[in-house]
Amino acid sequence: MQGDPAGALKIYREARSRYARNKALLYGQIDAQLADGQAQEALKTTTAELQLTPSDPILHGLQARSYAALGKRLQQHRAQAELYALQGQLVAAVQQLELAQKAGDGDFFEHSQVDARLRELKIRQQEEAKQKLPL
């Protein structure tokens, strides 16, 4: 299947019709969509699945790859930040959101969302730093 993304995609779709909630098949389907140049379809799939399971770091990573393939840098960094935040890597998450702020794309609404999430994560960073201080 490595050299045949379209064939792999067909197999994943058939398998998912039988096992719709199987995460491994879902991830494989999205990966095959990206390999087949179907970044917009991959983005639709990740976005729909994230509505159901917003705390899935793998989906956020696949969404970041989808945005990257579409050239949407702000959204790419934002999705990557969510992946890092879910993994507890707050420093990396903050860095990604700072990159998102500097991205030359995105509209006012998207920038506002990035700014708000950046504030949230910085507060969380400060709270965690306070908890680590010796008494």
Predicted region positions:
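Canonical positions in the second alpha-helix
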Residues: 15, 48-49, 83, 100
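Structural register within alpha-helical repeat arrays
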Residues: 29, 63, 80, 99-100, ...
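Alpha-helical linker/edge segments of TPR/alpha-solenoid repeat scaffolds
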Residues: 37-40, 69-79, 109, 119-135
